[in-house]
Amino acid sequence: MHNYVIIDAFASVPLEGNPVAVFFDADDLPPAQMQRIAREMNLSESTFVLKPRNGGDALIRIFTPVNELPFAGHPLLGTAIALGAHTDNHRLYLETQMGTIAFELERQNGSVIAASMDQPIPTWTALGRDAELLKALGISDSTFPIEIYHNGPRHVFVGLPSIDALSALHPDHRALSNFHDMAINCFAGAGRRWRSRMFSPAYGVVEDAATGSAAGPLAIHLARHGQIEFGQPVEILQGVEIGRPSLMFAKAEGRAEQLTRVEVSGNGVTFGRGTIVL
């Protein structure tokens, strides 16, 4: 038997944000079993908490319904908030396949209500399949260069001219499935406030409510293309079109040639608890 909790990440009230199922004491579960459990839960991600291997507080494995991820934003933020309920520490170190991720926890009346994470610094390059992607999205152009960022998962960014245009998107998901091992992030906005939608048949997600691993790269993308200054925090609202509004905050410090830190933060709230009988 294994206990789990469902955290709605990047939300301050239940039934908003992006849910993640966090399974505790999972050292006895083989990876194939973790994958089957994640498929049974059928959330965008489930995480499994194991004993640490490299001096952190816990080792975390992350599974979508179809594959394991080396790093993901909302599942780790939700996991940190879930683990924070079992410790008085204000800082947690969670081991992942992309290294150890540091978290700062924010508490209110004794409960963890938010967390911030230092994300892996990504690499990026031009996508090189612009026409094919634009056709799959049903649009004619991107307001910024179409580039792909890699920080564990791979995120492609496509700019839309307005929030109305972003909300009106109806992509061809079958065509998007030809973009293997990547998520397509479409965004619009100005200044410090931006809206985003993420589509990724490759990761088993038709549309994601909150993509924390893309929030940091989006802040970098905006700074690189002159929309904000490096070090300036941005607010990213996602999930509106699917009824799961999710609010993320991101900041990229340094400069394009030498990034020093990528920070993503947000709230999280417990939706439910349960036990699986295996």
From Swiss-Prot:
In which family does this protein belong, per the annotation? Belongs to the PhzF family.
Q: Where are its TM segments located?
A: none
Q: Which GO terms describe its molecular function?
A: trans-2,3-dihydro-3-hydroxy-anthranilate isomerase activity
Q: What does this protein do?
A: Isomerase that catalyzes the condensation of two molecules of trans-2,3-dihydro-3-hydroxyanthranilic acid (DHHA) into the phenazine ring system. The final product is not yet known.
Q: In which pathway does it act?
A: Antibiotic biosynthesis; phenazine biosynthesis
Q: What is its EC number?
A: 5.3.3.17
What is the protein name given in its UniProt record?
Trans-2,3-dihydro-3-hydroxyanthranilate isomerase
Oligomeric and partner information:
Homodimer.
User: Could you tell me the superkingdom of the organism this chain comes from?
Assistant: Bacteria
Gene Ontology CC entries for this record: cytoplasm
Q: Name one GO biological process term.
A: phenazine biosynthetic process
InterPro entries, sorted: Phenazine_PhzF-like
**Catalytic residues, chain numbering:** 45
Reaction catalysis annotation = (5S,6S)-6-amino-5-hydroxycyclohexa-1,3-diene-1-carboxyate = (1R,6S)-6-amino-5-oxocyclohex-2-ene-1-carboxylate
Keywords, A to Z, come to: Antibiotic biosynthesis, Isomerase, Virulence
